[in-house]
Amino acid sequence: MSFSQEPIPEVRSEWSIAAHGPDTPFRHWTVMQKYISDLIQRNGYQDYVEYNTTVERIEKEGDQWKIILRKEGAESDYWWKEYFDAVVVASGHYSVPYIPYIEGLEDLELQRPGSILHSKMYRGREAFRGKRVVVVGASVSAADIAVDLAGVAQSPVHAVVLGHKANVYFGDVAFKHPEIKEQRSISHIDTSRTVHFEDGGRVDDVDHIIFGTGYSWSLPFLPGVEKDPTLLFVGAVGAGLTFKIFEWQAVLAARILAGRARLPPLEEQQRWEADRIAARGDGGGFTLVFPEFEAYFETVRALAGPGVEGKGRQLPKFEQAWFDAFMAGHERRKALWKRWNAEGRRAKL
C-alpha cells in the first residue's frame, strides 16, 4: 500500500518469489527502508530532520509548545529546548512490547537471562535450533514465529492459542502445523523451568518463551494528553492500509495547520467519538479501521478538501482495488502456511 504518488519499487527477493510466486506483493524490509529514506531525502527534506535525537518532554507554554530534546554524546548527553506553534505526534504504536503478567516469568528471566523475549527482538530461527520453545500469542507475529521454528526448534513448538481469539485476517491456520502443539494460557512457571497451563498440562525444561502479544501505546514525552487544536496525531490507527492511511491523515493535518481546511465544531467531533465508542468500545477496537476502509478514507478526504486554490496534494477517491489487494495478500500468506502444513504432514509419513 504505497503513497498515492510514490510507488513502492518493484524489487522482489528470491525467498518471496519462491514462497508466493513471481508476482509476490511482499517486499524485503531493506526495500521498504530505502523507500522511506528516499522519500525523506528528496528535495532536501532531510535538512528538516534531527537524527539520533529523542523527544523527552512536550508541554504547552502560553501559545507555544516547548519541546525538550536530548542527543547522546561521547562523554555526556546534550539537552536543549525548542519552541513550536504546533506538534504532530507520529511516533507510531509498535515500539513498547506488551508482555502479560505471568507468575514466575520474571524469576525465570533472572535465572536464565535471555530466555524471555518479545517478537520485536526475534531475529531468526537459528538461535532456537534444538531448543524447547513456548510461543505466546494468537495473532500474526506469534503465528509467523511458531511456523518459522517448526522443524528447527525441539518438536513440538508449544503455541499458547487455545481460548484466545484468532486474528481476524489470518485465523488459526498457521498453528495447525504438525510440529506445533496448541496450548491453553499459562497459569504459572516454576523454578525448574516448567511452564504450567491452565488446563493442568505442562512443559518441562523450557529454554525460551517468545511473546507475540502486541504492543502498549506509549507517549512518555507527553505527560498529559492535551486538548489543544495545535496538537495532532498521525498514524494512531490499526489495520488501516499502511502507508496510504498515513498520507490521508498527514494531508488533513497539514491543511488544518496551514488554515486550508477546518474541522467541524467541537460538539460534532465529540459526537464522532461517542458514536465510535458505542460501536467499537474504548479499547483496541476503537483505533481499528477494518473493515470500514472506504468510509474512513472518504471522510478524511472530504475533510481535507482540495486545498485553497488547488495547492497541495490532491487525494484520490478510495478504490476497492486497494482493499482487494490488502485481503489478497493475507490469502497468499494463509496459502503458504497451508502448504507448509501439508509438507510437514507428508514429512511425518
Q: Where do the model's predicted regions map?
A:
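FAD-binding beta-loop-beta segment adjacent to the flavin cofactor pocket
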Residues: 1, 102-109, 218-231, 240, ...
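Short hydrophobic core segments
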Residues: 55, 79-95, 133-136, 205-214
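Glycine-rich active-site loop/strand segments that organize a redox cofactor
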Residues: 1-38, 62, 224, 231-232, ...
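C-terminal, flexible cofactor-proximal segment of oxidoreductases
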Residues: 230-349
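A conserved short coil-to-beta-strand element within the FAD-binding core of flavoproteins
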Residues: 51-66, 70-72, 101, 121-122, ...
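Glycine-rich dinucleotide-binding loop and its adjacent helix/turn
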Residues: 28, 32, 63, 86-149, ...
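Feature captures the FAD/FMN-dependent oxidoreductase FAD-binding
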Residues: 14-86, 91
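Short FAD-binding loop at a beta-strand-to-alpha-helix junction that anchors the flavin cofactor
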Residues: 3, 131-138, 224-241, 251
